[in-house]
Amino acid sequence: MVKETQYYDILGVKPSASPEEIKKAYRKLALKYHPDKNPDEGEKFKLISQAYEVLSDPKKRDIYDQGGEQAIKEGGSGSPSFSSPMDIFDMFFGGGGRMTRERRGKNVVHQLSVTLEDLYNGITKKLALQKNVICEKCEGIGGKKGSVEKCPLCKGRGMQVHIQQIGPGMVQQIQTVCIECKGQGERINPKDRCENCSGAKVTREKKIIEVHVEKGMKDGQKILFHGEGDQEPELDPGDVIIVLDQKDHSVFQRRGQDLIMKMKIQLSEALCGFKKTIKTLDDRVLVISSKSGEVIKHGDLKCIRNEGMPIYKAPLEKGVMIIQFLVVFPEKQWLSQEKLPQLEALLPPRQKVRITDDMDQVELKEFNPNEQSWRQHREAYEEDDEEPRAGVQCQTA
């Protein structure tokens, strides 16, 4: 049981969330609250990054679960600092850290919503993007030739350094973006600024790109368009990174290259046999049936070879389709008392129990999970969902 849930709440996941669920939550929130899209949500973006940095690291997550945020700040092992939110974002989306990008423009990251059918069959989607391009009129100078001068306030560094007192005899040095040149290190007299870009050196341009989603690609996979990102003077253009975001499917769940589904069958079908149909992601219909005399138990797993997801870059090969059977039992009093002996005669015999005088006779009651006494202890006794675990294999015979 975790001590506190603040970091989990920030990412919108449960304390029992898997590493994949944590990654997916960070991806969606980081793209939504990135300063380029939400300039006023810098603090929110920072909190999202801190939560992900802790929960994505097994050791830090264990420290947090046991001691909360205070244990993280104390370091657990002596390291109280967090990484830069932008570095976490860049490393997650494949852009590298700041030092690796210093001679290139910013990468542009976009999320593309796809269905499980899209990832199964492959699809080409057109995406309209806005990007910065070098101003054609001033050729990226920002104004008339010779009008650009070094910023007198920051001396061309683009940053200002302030000394702040934080206690008696204690000061700290704070570095901020220069308010005069907005971090550019230079300025242009307003009357000399380019009319086309207003001195910004770049203009916004709409570009349509075709995104080829190949068979077998997965949720969160990145598609790179090299050099199609924002342009900046004297820098190579950055990349456009498209991140695939798979919508939930009404029937199938994907686990690696396998497809998992749940199928309800009646008790009569579980005992006497069944014949069912399954519609695949490419609109074929599969017919499945149980063998004569075979009993299907609640929760049993069966699989169909070569009906899972196509293997990326080898689409003729596929994983398996795993079916979990859920046996639906009859409602109360579905059979009259007179017919119960007939049914019992057809079923395996009951297990005989020897009752002695020192045993306590108790009465079974209907259970209500919403009762107060249950809710207080529910977290301690949470049970796993009825889902098959990884490692299920089809038998060869």
Curated annotation (Swiss-Prot):
Positions of the UniProt region annotated as Disordered: 366-397
Residue ranges with Basic and acidic residues bias: 366-380
Propeptide: 395-397
Gene3D superfamilies: DnaJ domain, Heat shock protein DnaJ, cysteine-rich domain, Urease metallochaperone UreE, N-terminal domain
Keyword flag S-adenosyl-L-methionine: no
Pfam families reported in the protein's UniProt record: DnaJ, DnaJ_C, DnaJ_CXXCXGXG
Segments forming CR-type zinc fingers: 122-206
GO cellular component labels: cytosol; membrane
Superkingdom per UniProt: Eukaryota
Entry's localization field: Membrane
PANTHER family given in the database record: DNAJ-LIKE-2, ISOFORM A-RELATED
Protein name, entry field: DnaJ homolog subfamily A member 4
Organism: Mus musculus (Mouse)
Gene for this chain: Dnaja4
